Swiss-Prot record:
Binding site for (E)-4-coumaroyl-AMP: Y240, A310, Q332, G333, T337, M345, K438, K442
InterPro entries in alphabetical order: AMP-bd_C, AMP-bd_C_sf, AMP-binding_CS, AMP-dep_synth/lig_dom, ANL_N_sf
Superkingdom, natural source: Eukaryota
Protein name listed in UniProt: 4-coumarate--CoA ligase 2
Binding residues for CoA: K261, K444, G445
Lineage: Eukaryota, Viridiplantae, Streptophyta, Embryophyta, Tracheophyta
Entry function: Carboxylate--CoA ligase that may use 4-coumarate as substrate. Follows a two-step reaction mechanism, wherein the carboxylate substrate first undergoes adenylation by ATP, followed by a thioesterification in the presence of CoA to yield the final CoA thioester.
Amino acid sequence: MGDCVAPKEDLIFRSKLPDIYIPKHLPLHTYCFENISKVGDKSCLINGATGETFTYSQVELLSRKVASGLNKLGIQQGDTIMLLLPNSPEYFFAFLGASYRGAISTMANPFFTSAEVIKQLKASLAKLIITQACYVDKVKDYAAEKNIQIICIDDAPQDCLHFSKLMEADESEMPEVVIDSDDVVALPYSSGTTGLPKGVMLTHKGLVTSVAQQVDGDNPNLYMHSEDVMICILPLFHIYSLNAVLCCGLRAGVTILIMQKFDIVPFLELIQKYKVTIGPFVPPIVLAIAKSPVVDKYDLSSVRTVMSGAAPLGKELEDAVRAKFPNAKLGQGYGMTEAGPVLAMCLAFAKEPYEIKSGACGTVVRNAEMKIVDPETNASLPRNQRGEICIRGDQIMKGYLNDPESTRTTIDEEGWLHTGDIGFIDDDDELFIVDRLKEIIKYKGFQVAPAELEALLLTHPTISDAAVVPMIDEKAGEVPVAFVVRTNGFTTTEEEIKQFVSKQVVFYKRIFRVFFVDAIPKSPSGKILRKDLRAKIASGDLPK
């Protein structure tokens, strides 16, 4: 008989910070407002465009009124509403109101085309849409067909209600709702590691855990307090902003300064005027700050924390932006929508900070486990060896909506979420991202699914095959480019194809270059060999 070999134990990495108590039984809204007795009269939201201010007590009350208003419109516990909105105070009231009602918010990018919004409406089964008048045309026909109520936060067109109707509801008429910690509260859409966008089911327990991992405890990983002012420039339809700004900000009692869109001069003016202390950014904003000559005209000395996430930030860019914020600690976090979203965060942001290295994206968050695995064998790897990053903890998603197969592909039987990102953990527990297994293209932090663009390209009558891959771009990080096989006899041009795509997708999904080839490289099973195409781009060996 052969020797009995014990199974190899996983090499698991944990935070340098000790685990903490997390009140996972609380609904998200209760958790966010748990400290309201201490901050009730303090400014909670400031509308950067108008200067209008709401206290914590007002935000909490208006959110409960919206919950009652949703109930009066027939929204039941477990129903889904769509938020098709730019950053605004109403975004907070709507999301929190839905949470109080026991409903689910699915967040859509207002710049989506009508087809993209309707696809998400269909998939999420949303029963109500909260939007602005300028976006109503994208949804009105589908909403009329499916009897979906549209609510506008500004001048409501015909057949639409004004958001004030929700805010005027009597909060005392809201029926009691018993929320289970495993109930879904947010349904962002993500392409995951591959394929088309899917609904990511984030629960009350998951988001409470993720927020607590960042801002709770005696030595929070992300130290924020009630005297802080945090700028909300990242779109709230992105999970990074929804989690780090809306949820973490409310939990920590900070003042949240809302900006609808990024424009460098108004952005700098607001930082100076309101003495912003915390800036959650993405690399394109960091790049704009680093390169803009106007930055030096403004006093940015109030800023003490600059966080960057959603896409990797290079060491050179880190160093360049440090000079612009003389009193700030700059660091990165690492997230993925399916992970709730934060997997790792820079410990320079802690109340009792640690030394960090440039280029690192933090250490694994508390109350969670991380491992690095060999993508081929799934065996866990030691420090300083590159492999796929996996995370386990209560913060990760419940699964993909109505897609058990993709859920099983992403979360294994032992509860490990496989990110599709390649990285390593060094001797100081810091995580470095070096590559991606997954196919997703990151344009300015936005996800672009190659499969979605490939499916669209193949509807063009003169294209017989197509593949979409990323190309490195200094401003955007990555841009989508297409390799296209023309149908025999046709001479379709690059410009025609780019126009064909741009008419049907949101701006960040537009094709930047088209390369015509005789065939798309594929494996025997028919899978596109994207590495071969990426190698062509890297070497400059591109068809004319």
